[in-house]
């Protein structure tokens, strides 16, 4: 029997990415306290949260594969979250200007039959152009990236902020490492092709 697929996320970006592989899935809101633990590294944080999200859906029935994902952005060795305000978005982009920032994306696939989770972390680097405050403000006013870690949307005008991108899968930057997910699903017996 083929496993049913659940995305433990309410993110429209993750739903859109997952729909690219043309498998039927349902999206469920995970129950997860996303507060970092004291002295927790970015990698440990995102893998812990991805696995917690995948395990938090309360599905006891066998034959489900539940996908959990979490992402943080690190600027100058400091974890930054979603800015939520214009002022904070401008501040984050000023800190990123001319620097490399790193996104860590945790991905977990929980198998409800075996009660086992396969969890990884994928890294993606973004090299920012040297930006003026005016360029940053123009970008923030046009795209309003208040609910995006790092204060940009790479799938939109945010691409103009970058000098180069470095990573295995560009989907990782948006929040769901699709190439790795396909490998993980196939390992669980769910073939995409």
Swiss-Prot record:
The active site is at 70 (proton acceptor). The keyword Cell cycle does not apply. One of its GO terms (biological process) is nucleotide metabolic process. Its EC number is 3.6.1.-. GO terms for molecular function: nucleoside triphosphate diphosphatase activity. The keyword Metal-binding does not apply. It is found in: Cytoplasm. It catalyses: N(7)-methyl-GTP + H2O = N(7)-methyl-GMP + diphosphate + H(+). It is an enzyme of class 3 (hydrolase). It holds the Pfam family Maf. Its cofactor is a divalent metal cation. One of its GO terms (cellular component) is cytoplasm. Keywords: Cytoplasm, Hydrolase, Nucleotide metabolism. The record marks 13, 71, 155 as: Important for substrate specificity. Gene3D superfamilies: 3.90.950.10. NCBIfam families: maf. Nucleoside triphosphate pyrophosphatase that hydrolyzes 7-methyl-GTP (m(7)GTP). May have a dual role in cell division arrest and in preventing the incorporation of modified nucleotides into cellular nucleic acids. Belongs to the Maf family. YceF subfamily. PANTHER family: 7-METHYL-GTP PYROPHOSPHATASE (PTHR43213:SF10), BIFUNCTIONAL DTTP/UTP PYROPHOSPHATASE/METHYLTRANSFERASE PROTEIN-RELATED (PTHR43213). This is 7-methyl-GTP pyrophosphatase.
């Amino acid at each position: 029997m083929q496993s049913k697929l659940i995305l433990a996320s309410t993110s429209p970006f993750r739903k859109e990415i997952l729909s690219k592989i043309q498998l039927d899935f349902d999206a469920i809101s995970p129950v997860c306290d996303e507060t970092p633990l004291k002295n927790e590294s970015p990698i440990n944080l995102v893998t812990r949260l991805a696995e917690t999200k995948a395990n938090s859906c309360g599905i006891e029935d066998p034959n489900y594969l539940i996908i959990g994902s979490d992402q943080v952005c690190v600027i100058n060795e400091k974890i930054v979250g979603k800015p939520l305000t214009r002022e904070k978005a401008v501040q984050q982009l000023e800190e990123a200007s001319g620097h490399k920032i790193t996104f860590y994306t945790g991905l977990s696939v929980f198998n409800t039959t075996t009660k086992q989770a396969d969890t990884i972390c994928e890294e993606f680097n973004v090299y920012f152009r040297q930006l003026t405050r005016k360029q940053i403000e123009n970008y923030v006013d046009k795209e309003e990236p208040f609910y995006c870690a790092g204060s940009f949307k790479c799938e939109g005008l945010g691409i103009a902020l970058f000098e180069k991108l470095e990573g295995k899968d560009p989907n990782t930057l948006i929040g769901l490492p699709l190439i790795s997910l396909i490998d993980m699903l196939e390992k669980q017996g769910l073939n995409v092709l």
